A protein has these predicted regions:
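Carbohydrate-active catalytic/glycan-binding domains of CAZyme proteins
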Residues: 1-143
Length: 143
């Protein structure tokens, strides 16, 4: 990394309370996006700000809620937001209430340009490229 484009900053305080698995994404327009696991592990939230510090006070929007049963009905963990090929995606782990440790990676895609306001579509479980990936406990992945 070119040191003229890098500035180290220390954050010595709690960033956002009651949020596990935090993920911050800096978009090409300079805005920062935040998502994380919530204590109830039942939904996916987003925050947006023009600064990293601003994320702490930014409005939190629930963009998706767990299913009542079946896949994606329990242990909604470790979401990440990414912008790929001009589309917004959230990758996260989720379990099945009938087998709560059958945690697998899933994908949501925003159907518009505004992740805070536009609807999100469930794209399903990530598809493995081999015979062993995602066949067992799978979480905290990245793209």
């Amino acid at each position: 990394m070119d040191k003229t484009n890098y500035r180290q900053t220390e954050y010595n305080k709690p960033f956002i309370i009651q949020r596990a698995d935090p993920y911050v994404y800096r978009h090409s327009d300079g805005t920062y996006w935040f998502t994380a696991s919530v204590p109830e592990y039942d939904r996916i939230i987003l925050r947006k700000s023009n600064t990293v510090d601003g994320l702490a006070q930014a409005e939190e929007v629930t963009i998706w809620r767990k299913h009542e049963n079946g896949i994606m009905s329990v242990h909604i963990w470790a979401p990440e937001i990414h912008y790929v090929d001009n589309k917004w995606f959230i990758y996260f782990a989720g379990g099945d209430i009938e087998d709560i440790w059958a945690i697998r990676p899933y994908v949501l895609m925003c159907e518009g340009d505004d992740p805070l306001k536009d609807p999100w579509k469930e794209m399903g479980m990530l598809k493995p490229k081999d015979a062993f990936s995602f066949q067992d406990f799978s979480l905290d992945m990245t793209v």
